């Protein structure tokens, strides 16, 4: 079964929504989010730079380590959100796991690079972070879904617009539970 353009676009919306929701909950401000493909990616979440103090190559101060952890969580969140969504679909393409891995290669490269500043036990650290991020996303799945739906209507959002969509999804979540 070939993945349709609609399926790929939905997967991208969930992928980018995962990044944005985790960034929001890790207090990492985002500049914007898009699911409009360009030469480099199918979508992206952009962040403001952390500041000149963020030099993981020069030290392991607590705030540097916290920033590494936050950005590792954010980097893992896209693939994990896409996976959670794909697992919930009644019909899956034959190669759906490979499609997710392929789409997340750039994210994973960045995550491994950041993790290597944190610890020499990168594999174990990332396995722990994946469990943490999956739990974080599952607890906030309505926000992920709400933002993914909003991105279907508005494929390019500023950080403020994305935050508003997350707040609206949170209100809806509380109203229906």
Positions of PLM-derived features:
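Soluble catalytic regions of large protease machineries
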Residues: 2-177
């Amino acid at each position: 079964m070939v993945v349709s353009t609609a399926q790929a676009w939905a997967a991208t919306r969930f992928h980018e929504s995962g990044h944005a929701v985790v960034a929001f909950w890790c207090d990492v401000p985002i500049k914007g989010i898009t699911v409009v493909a360009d030469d480099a990616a199918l979508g992206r979440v952009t962040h403001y730079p952390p500041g000149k103090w963020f030099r993981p190559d020069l030290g392991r101060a607590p705030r540097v380590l916290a920033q590494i952890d936050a950005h590792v969580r954010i980097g893992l969140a896209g693939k994990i959100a896409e996976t959670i969504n794909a697992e919930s679909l009644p019909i899956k393409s034959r190669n759906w796991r490979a499609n997710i891995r392929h789409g997340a290669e750039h994210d994973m490269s960045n995550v491994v690079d950041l993790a290597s500043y944190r610890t020499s036990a990168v594999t174990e650290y990332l396995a722990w972070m994946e469990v943490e991020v999956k739990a974080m996303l599952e607890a906030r799945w309505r926000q992920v879904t709400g933002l993914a739906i909003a991105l279907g209507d508005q494929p390019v959002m500023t950080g403020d617009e994305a935050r508003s969509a997350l707040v609206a999804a949170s209100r809806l979540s509380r109203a229906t539970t």
